[in-house]
Amino acid sequence: MQRTGLLLLLIASLVSPLLCSAEQGRVLKLDGNWKVEHVYVDEDSTSTNLMALISDDPTLRGRIFEFTPDKIKTSIPTASRCELPDYVSMDVTSINSLMSGTTEVQLSDPAKSYALPVKGTLDIRPYRIHCQNGAISPSDEHSEHWLVKLDEESIFLNWDNQSYLLLKKLADNATLQPSFACARATSDSEKTICHDSDLSSWDVSVAEAYNVALKQIVNTGVDVKSRSVELRKTQKRWLDERNACFVNPACLKKKMQDRVDELVELAKQ
């Protein structure tokens, strides 16, 4: 009987953490799709690592995170897939204290430096994310990832290159719209984009990246007219190339992802 009791205690000690972790996932109510609403970076930092991303970077903004009990999957091209995620409750702390552990440079007020929509003194309970298999992001093996449920519709998550993401909950069966009016779509490529939420989100990202690149040209004040004209010409040529994909979703997605990368790099100059 004594041995049986010890065996049961041993089993309970092994199973209990798993049950607690699963319970944390249910308490957090993460199941469903979440859209990257904002990308926060410290634009004043001189760190070359931070130049990998820009504020509200179109490569990340608009992407989808899918949370289920079995996985965390995202449409971010370079991201991995986190299988059997555990959410480990951390001590209550302030936003600033939490961010200080994941920023390269010590900032007096990280929330302010990153222009977050909340005060750095806000007390929150973060949850450390542990993937039993796989990873959330490309650098997951080198950094710790956590999330904060700001409210029922908002998640604050640390990401790569010392960036932070604000995720917004999507309604069940929500469909994403492209940057153009689908009612006026004429080409095969536009019609294909209109019928695919992922392609639609990338179309929006192309439009946002184009506007960011154009704004950067204007902000430099150097050869604004000629460079703006050249940007419009290259965008027109790219649209012709995109339309050559016709109804091929993989081709359309690749074209749009590559164009977003090109425009974001231009915006960094």
What do the predicted segments below correspond to?
Residues 1-7:
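Positively charged n-region of N-terminal signal peptides that target proteins for export
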Residues 7-17:
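Bacterial N-terminal signal peptides
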Residues 23-24, 29-30, 39, 45, ...:
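N-terminal alpha-helical modules
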Residues 33-35:
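A short tyrosine-centered beta-strand micro-motif
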Residues 40-43, 67-142, 229-232, 240, ...:
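Contiguous, well-ordered beta-strand patches that form the walls/edges
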Residues 44-51:
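Short, conserved, GDST-rich strand-edge loop motifs in beta-rich repeat architectures
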Residues 63-66, 145-150:
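Short, exposed beta-strand/loop patches in secreted or surface proteins that constitute
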